[in-house]
UniProtKB/Swiss-Prot annotation:
Residue stretches of biased makeup (Polar residues): 1125-1137, 1382-1394
UniProt keyword Ribosomal protein present: no
Subunit structure: Interacts with spectrin via SPTBN1; the interaction is direct. Interacts with calmodulin; calcium-dependent it prevents interaction with spectrin.
Region ranges (Sufficient for interaction with calmodulin): 920-939
Designated gene of the protein: Camsap1
Keyword set, alphabetical order: Coiled coil, Cytoplasm, Cytoskeleton, Microtubule, Phosphoprotein
Record PTM Phosphothreonine, positions in chain: 531
Notes on the domains: The CKK domain binds microtubules.
A biological process term (GO) from this entry: regulation of cell morphogenesis
Gene3D superfamilies per the UniProt record, alphabetical: CKK domain
Name under which the protein is recorded: Calmodulin-regulated spectrin-associated protein 1
Pfam families in the record: CAMSAP_CC1 (PF17095), CAMSAP_CH (PF11971), CAMSAP_CKK (PF08683)
Annotated ranges, domain Calponin-homology (CH): 235-350
Amino acid sequence: MVDAGGRSAAEGWRRMEAPPEGADLVPLDRYDAARAKIAANLQWICAKAYGLDNIPEDLRDPFYIDQYEQEHIKPPVIKLLLSSELYCRVCSLILKGDQAATLQGHQSVIQALSRKGIYVMESDDTPVTDADLSQAPIKMSGHMAMVDALMMAYTVEMISIEKVVASVKRFSTFSASKELPYDLEDAMVFWINKVNLKMREITEKEVKLKQQPLESPAHQKPGLEHAVMHCMLEPVDFARVVRYRREHLSARQSPYFPLLEDLMRDGSDGAALLAVVHYYCPEQMKLDDICLKEVPSMADSLYNIRLLREFSNEHLNKCFYLTLEDMLYAPLVLKPNVMVFIAELFWWFENVKPDFVQPRDIQELKDAKTVLQQKSSRPPVPISNATKRSFLGSPAAMSPADLPPSTQPLTEGSHRYHLHSEEPECLGKGASTFSPSHPLLPLRQKQQKVSQAEEIPDQRHRSNSLTRADGQPRGAAIAWPDKKNRPVSQPTSFALHHAASCDVDPSSGDSISLARSISKDSLASNIIHLTPQNQPHPSAGKTNGKSLLSNVNIEDDEEEELVAIIRTDVSPHSPEIPRTSPQAPGLVASIRSPQRQADTLESKPDSFYLEPLMPAVLRPAKEKQIITKEDERGEGRPRTIMAKRPSEGSQPLVRKKVTGSHGSRDLNRTFTPIPCSEFAASIDPTEVGPQSTEATGEGQPLALGRFDPVPQGQVADGFFLHVGRAEEDEGRWYVGSQSPSSHDSEPWTILRQDSDSDVVDVEDAEQDFIGEDHPVVIPRYAGEEESAKLQEDMKVKEHEDKDDASGRSSPCLSTTSQLSSMSMASGSVKMTSFAERKLQRLNSCETKSSTSSSQKTTPDASESCPAPLTTWRQKREQSPSRHSKDPASLLASELVQLHMQLEEKRRAIEAQKKKMEALSARQRLKLGKAAFLHVVKKGKADGAPQPLRPEHFTKEFTQHNGEDLDDGTCKTEGFLVKEEQRDLSDSQDVAFVQLHKPRDPATLHDGEKHRVISAALLEDSVGEVDVNECDLSIEKLNETISTLQQAILKISQQQEQLLMKSPTVPTSGTKNNCQDQKVKAPVHFVEPLSPTGVPGHRKPPRLGQGRNSRSGRPAELKVPKDRQQGCSRSKTPTPSVETLPHSRSLPPSTHPRSPLDPGGELPEKCLFDSYRLHDESNHRTFGLSSCKDANIVSEQMNFKEGLDTSVQEAELSSSAITGKEHTPMEEPLRSKASLIEVDLSDLKAPDEDGEVVGHESSLELGGESDQKPGVGFFFKDEQKAEDELAKKRAAFLLKQQRKAEEARARKQQLEAEVELKRDEARRKAEEDRLRKEEEKARRELIKQEYLRRKQQQALEEQGLGKPKSKPKKPRPKSVHREESCSDSGTKCSSTPDNLSQTHSGSSLSLASAATTEPESVHSGGTPSHRVESLEALPILSRNPSRSTDRDWETASAASSLASVAEYTGPKLFKEPSSKSNKPIIHNAISHCCLAGKVNEPHKNSILEELEKCDANHYIILFRDAGCQFRALYCYQPDTEEIYKLTGTGPKSITKKMIDKLYKYSSDRKQFNLIPAKTMSVSVDALTIHNHLWQPKRPTVPKKTQTRK
């Protein structure tokens, strides 16, 4: 390394190795921080005062050791400090010229600093004074504080937050809302971290570029190769860095650029600062010279500190004023010293910018990349499997080779944020590809920081830059800071994540937040930009049978939200080819195994790769996945299963390859149990449908969710309440169009599900069943009703979720929502906001009330954000890192806009809902009546039916769904659970007992179709339900009732047990919840809640929401507190439930449903079943799909508000149970009759199943019990059930409407009250203002009157005035009055109007008004030092005339303020008193000047002369300030003549002779000095200059008049 001066690095190294520092390093136990502080401060101030090279010898070392081996500060140093010379010198360098010249003494320096906002304070916050600094013996603490203040002043001059932000903007990006520094220290950390992140990015890019040719695991050793290459290519002096280079060669993969969290603690090794130096001065400070280790040793730290000091000495004017120990041990007392050094660095690099300062630019990387790209004209080669494997093994090791630059042009349709469009490839080594300069997610940095802290507890967590998690090891390139590394093999075209998520370090919260932002933030839209719709659809056919999933890599890290990477190319092998399938919009939720993903990644280096890098995604056992061989091969309806994410933690590691991770298609990608929402967030809904179809190869939509992906060609603008595909005639809402075309026709039709609740429930359920279904793929099967129905269901579900989660939508977009959000993002709708809102909602949802309200508030949100996203977001939110980095918080403005848009949509939706609700309510009433009659008849005829048997349910499911229910027991158990739950909760909420049974994908799809149809028909057919169906429903209901009764008895006894068993129950509970959600009525959905410990689960909130949905239905979305509480309670027990949904892949032991879980289909089946139940119940309850058409339209309105809560809950459970219930839509219409709504509180028969139900109900109802009696849905005769459900639904809707109206009324009342208060306050304010104005006007009139009279008197004086002004009688009166006024202390106060304002001063003499005794002079007292200006007095100041001396004259009619008061008050009318001060002079002579027996003769003679004279104004002459009477003079204001009347003194007094003027205060009987130099009528006495007195001249008795 050769510095600017030409000295070699070796020389510097030798110099640094000089014995003093190297050998004499003070060990920590002997290091004296206090001494070090004194030495550092003194060295700094001396260097600044004299210049480092000109410091006097005796000051260079401030310490000396005496004969007793005691160390002391040298006397010259102490003398300098006490003299303030050093301080003045240094301070003058900071101040401007004029100010600097005035610096004399410590006080002036302290004041100068305080003017700059810097206060000299000791450590105990006591201010340092001049006395402290001048104190002898010296008080070092005060002087250290002074030096610290000067250092801070220097620091402020050299660096500021604005300068730092401006500097960082040039090479990086940051989140203004989250990362803006709040003080100078934070600004320094911010700057250093940003530079280090930039260096990470640069070095990672360099390494990738160098290693790009390597596709073998060898690329994992870039550090070694780099070091070798560097050493070979660069003629660097080896001597300096032999040791370090050796380390490079031996073990170093890449330099680790640390990120600081604490300036002193984290910066003490010098690595971060050296990285900054290298960034700005790459030639002077070689990167290889710096020891950049993640965990540097002390030797490394010393090496770095020496290097830093050497650089400072050589290039920065020796600004490093610390010792090695100071920097190494970094005691807090030295923080000001370190800060001033960093400020100086910043100043040199950003302000001075010497020639050697040449910041590294990314351009060099770009150039290198260009070269590399030119090298290979062919599109980037897909990453080899070996490379992928190696990458999977250690993502960090991934080399650029693995991530070939995406030469593939972005599809025109893909509007990606190319943070670095030119740098799409993931940076191996955990280098985050996003350059700080490219804002991925502005807010992510902080979030990343949090997530990093969580994720990488062992790492030093430094504030993350946008690009990467601070604490993340550079070696790991993780797109998402999931705890798992994900392969970054695929460079994502998605510039948003900038080079595939691999950019981000494994711990990089940025990546995570990016993914999050995708789901939550408008960034999602960016991702979506790449959606097929946006991107050109090269070929309609699916590419390589890969569905969008190939483009979208979704992985759910336990905490990581979905990491959906949308690839531009569908074809794994032709990355350069944009997704060919026009259906690309269809998202295949199928999950690829990591290998699959890797292949896909390889194939699509350019495609978006948001999926978090995971070490190797564990493939859940196939047995646990609901994946058929067909699905795996992509032949079946691979329902893009969002591998349901473990309930936020219940089974975080379980990843389902929903679609058969092992399949050859991308769909097989291992799917981390990403909540549907997560999955959706990453997946573009538009891509989902068509793509999934492609992926399937059959064009069948993966059962991802009933998302009807937006038509391939069109971008899903967002979820639309409009029944895109819904056949309103049938009263069914098609969330997804049944056919691809329908999908196209309706971009995301109503997804009723509460984003949040659905997200949670649906996430779980769908993740299990639909996991992929709902969110991921609603691929449209070109004519498949199933897919359409599923999509419809999903949409309905999402609508409900929206209602519930609309508020929550932002927290988690349901998968569909996420997809849609992504698509919407691309399209225009910002799902991000939904996701964010959903997240917020979940958080509040956890508070529950917020969930329902928020969602209701934003129906669109739910649509746009199905529950899965919510879950995903919730997880993130719950995890601190997530929260901090949540993109939601990131784009505040964007969110605000989204919120506004959502609000508008919500209003429109609510209006529509109201209409639909009215229709559905009427329909329900009719159906309810019919059902009731049927039930009554049936009940009489049949008597109490026997408890439903699992087989019975199964049959019903089969019948209704037209599908075989694999687990009838599941239903029954779920039903029983519901019953028990009802009993336990005594909640009136309808719980859907039907459990989803695992089904074959086809079956599920069919079931979904049927369900959709049945649900859709339910509403329509509810009225048309055959009597037979009603009878069947009634029979079932009766059986259910008996069962429930039995169950209730057991439940009462086993509540505790049930709660403990709840984990098993939860699944059914979840299903029930889903059903409940759909029920929408008091239906409280028992959604499996994540264990209390599972923060990620939103379900509990949803439950609350579900219950509250109706309540919350009003835009207020307020969840009844009891419900919220109940939700919370249910949450707690629900954890097991929620866990179950998540653990759909959990062993059967968990739940009756669990048996299904092993196959992974059970959840789906259960979901379907529950969905069927929903559909069946929806016939009456919330067939989300069917009810949604008629009911949903109206209910969506209501539900979104009411159901939003209840649906959120229900959907939480139902989505968990039904996997978004939409998935179950396959069930035949028959299912509608299979459910019967039963008041859980009515059922009392304990039953084995009842226990199960009880468990679930205890979970579910635990929250509900407070809310409402639980109503359970049981499979009964479809007709009867429908009737019951219709009635209950109608009643529930009416109840919700009433509640909403009441809430609105309350709200309006509150608003009216608030408005009244405001009006009252405004009125009072107006009255006060008017009163003040009137007072002002009155005063002005008085003043004008006074001036007029004054003028008139002046005229009279000139002419006739004297005789009138002379009257003695008025004069005495005025005197008396004045005296009385002054005595009262409120002379002028006597005049209420004018004096009221002036009285403050009028009561006192002008001087006395100040009430400063010192100023006032008693006749015999000592002169007062304080001068009160009359003008300062209120009266005088108030009078505009005051500006002239005349003012004094006017006021001087009475020399005291009393006299002034006279003018303002009634005394104004006494012209004599106003123009003559004779009474005042009379009083002064009598009571002050010549008081007492001794002076009586003299006094009498003086008074006689006074009475004889006709003059208006008199002046007393004093000898001096002692106020010793000498003579009485007459004063003519017109001529300003003062001539002697009697006494000893000059015959006349001129202006020049006057020394001081006094005014007499009659009340205080003393003279007060007037701060004026000119005579006026207000003056009562004066003194002349001392030299005018002749000592010989005899004087009047010289008895000093003491001031009274």
